[in-house]
Amino acid sequence: MKTELSLLDRSLNLQRYPKRAQELLQAWDAGDEYIIKYVEEELNLEDGKNILILNDNFGALSCWFSDKHNVTMMTDSFVSQRGTLKNLQRNQCNRVQLITSTEEMPQGFDLVLMQIPKNNRMLTWQLQQLRQSMDSSCPIIAVNKAKEIHSSTLELFEDYLGETKTSLAWKKHRLVFSNANVSNPKTIAEAVCWSVDNEDIDLLNYPNVYSGEKLDQGARFMLDHIPSDPELRHIIDLGCGNGVLSVKAGQLNPEARITCVDESFMAVESAHRNLEVNLGKERQFQFIANNCLDGFKKHSSYLVLCNPPFHQGQAITDHIAWQMFCDAKHILCKDGKLLVIGNRHLDYDGKLCRLFGEENVTTVASNSKFVILEAVKAEKSK
């Protein structure tokens, strides 16, 4: 896979995070290249400008513009943040301030660059924050694949931010130009709250939480199959989202210590709030933004709950699920269990059989769309 971004007589070595032996995906896209070309060729910025970059996938924009400017990068993704840091170090770039989506949006910028997020509610929230934080003279330039920029996308920019126009397409990407100048902007709440039908569970969801406006069908199915067992002293919810599975596990296992892990800072913050509200602040909880289970001790958990994502940013991929399964096996105690929910077509059973052994993988439940699989770590497993 190509790792050298060569553009305008400059080169950067950029790699995705975490680094894989046989990487199939690139650490930047044509959208990054389009923004770089436009800023360098059309804006003629003086050195030392203050630039805010939102949703930089693996730091291509941060690395490039930190050469001559003061860059702040804001993201909801732990993986993107860590990947950006690694690429900054790899290219010996100037210091970039890295902040998370749960922090207050800073002010005082001369230019804002944005990779448009996949989640429309996250986009709307970021546009609202930009309208409140940026001067009307500050150019805001966003990018996405042309096929993903609809008239409804541009309406969001105009309703929540200000006057908006678009570029011509280049390498199947398009730029969106806007300024924070709408006189009567629409507003949205920071969080969406709702209750789970037929459960004693109330959930708060920050903007970038997966399925934040209603319970996804996979999680709904999984709720009915979470075990209750006094031997489950430590339960990990891997890819926890808003923490709904953790809340149910905590209700069924009141003595268990529960750890919620997600690569989204907003998901982790949502889970933190939801476990404390539904289960009480006196319980033993831990909330970690992380790349899967990096850094967890071996043989440290009795049950891992897992509802894996099948995309990383805009890219469709199954390597995250595979890493989750491998990490879960590593940290499970002997006879510990991994409970996985997934779409039937994703072949998680094949992956789990390869990893845990066919005799240690069983189907707990299935319906027309989903399957719940249990993998047990046998005594001989390492």
From Swiss-Prot:
Keyword terms of this UniProt record: Cytoplasm, Methyltransferase, rRNA processing, S-adenosyl-L-methionine, Transferase
Enzymatic class: transferase
Lyase among keywords: no
Taxonomy, superkingdom: Bacteria
Gene3D superfamilies cross-referenced by the UniProt entry: Vaccinia Virus protein VP39
MF terms in GO: 23S rRNA (guanine(1835)-N(2))-methyltransferase activity
Catalytic activity: guanosine(1835) in 23S rRNA + S-adenosyl-L-methionine = N(2)-methylguanosine(1835) in 23S rRNA + S-adenosyl-L-homocysteine + H(+)
Keyword match Metal-binding: no
Subcellular compartments: Cytoplasm
One GO CC term, this protein: cytoplasm
EC number: 2.1.1.174
Family: Belongs to the methyltransferase superfamily. RlmG family.
Protein role: Specifically methylates the guanine in position 1835 (m2G1835) of 23S rRNA.
HAMAP family in the cross-refs: 23SrRNA_methyltr_G
Identification of the protein by name: Ribosomal RNA large subunit methyltransferase G
Organism the protein comes from: Aliivibrio fischeri (strain ATCC 700601 / ES114) (Vibrio fischeri)
Lineage, uppermost ranks: Bacteria, Pseudomonadati, Pseudomonadota, Gammaproteobacteria, Vibrionales
